[in-house]
């Protein structure tokens, strides 16, 4: 497998969030418990983030060159063209995606750290 774009940066930022671990299924997945929030799908060579729905809809309209819808059953994920994002933007979007799956106690831990 070739290394996904910005893998090192994404792995570092994702693993800095409370409770995150990495697994592998057709590419790296970043999860809290059994719930994924960011993954690289090798067959489509795409990063996919689980962003909040209201944020997704805004991004699909405002930044279509970077964000596109990806539906899995009833769940809407976002294809993310990570090369178009700065490290600060990646951190913000990964944190937003993480919040969609992280339990409240872990979210409190992050708030206590000032994020």
Label every PLM stretch briefly.
Residues 1-115:
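Charge-dense, helix-prone N-terminal extensions
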């Amino acid at each position: 497998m070739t290394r996904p774009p910005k893998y090192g940066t994404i792995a570092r930022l994702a693993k800095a969030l409370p409770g995150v671990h990495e697994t592998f299924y057709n590419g790296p997945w970043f999860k809290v418990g059994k719930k994924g929030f960011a993954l690289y799908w090798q067959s489509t060579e795409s990063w996919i983030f689980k962003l909040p729905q209201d944020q997704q809809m805004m991004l699909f309209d405002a930044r279509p060159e970077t964000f596109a819808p990806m539906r899995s059953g009833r769940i809407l994920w976002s294809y993310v063209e990570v090369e178009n994002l700065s490290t600060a933007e990646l951190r913000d979007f990964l944190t937003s995606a993480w919040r969609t799956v992280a339990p409240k106690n872990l979210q409190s831990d992050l708030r206590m750290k000032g994020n």
